[in-house]
Amino acid sequence: MADQATQHHLVLIIARDFASRLATPVFLVDARGSVIYFNESAERVLGRRFMEGSGMDAEEWSTVFAPSDDDGNPVGLADLPLGVAIREQHPDHRMLRITSIDGTERRIEVTAFPLFAHEDECLGAIAVFWEAPDAER
């Protein structure tokens, strides 16, 4: 059957369960950067329901919310905390501005880190984020 659900490693299943229980926005991707899950709190910040964003690849989620720095310069996948966590396999933290799907501009603080099953087996990454106070421009 071609449309079978993707089987995920137990670590990712547990991470998804953990994220589903948090009030803090959480975004979870696999090792290729495809969206596995984001919780209801993330839905409110992003302006998109998980069912509409499930399976987005890294290229899509890294651009659809128009991430930029405080000066308005676009921030590409390679410089986004989740991109760093996937590509370089180490934690990263950054302040960003995004535009949610409903057009609301938000300033968020993001911390992302890779998820390992074993020291040399990165399964994906998780980003925890929250709305941050607006900086003086």
Question: For each predicted feature, which ranges?
Answer:
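Sensory modules in modular signal-transduction proteins
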Residues: 6-34, 40
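Sensory-domain boundary/capping and coupling elements
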Residues: 13, 136-137
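Sensory helix hotspots in PAS and closely related PAS-like folds
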Residues: 43-44
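PAS/PAC sensory module
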Residues: 93-97, 107-110, 126
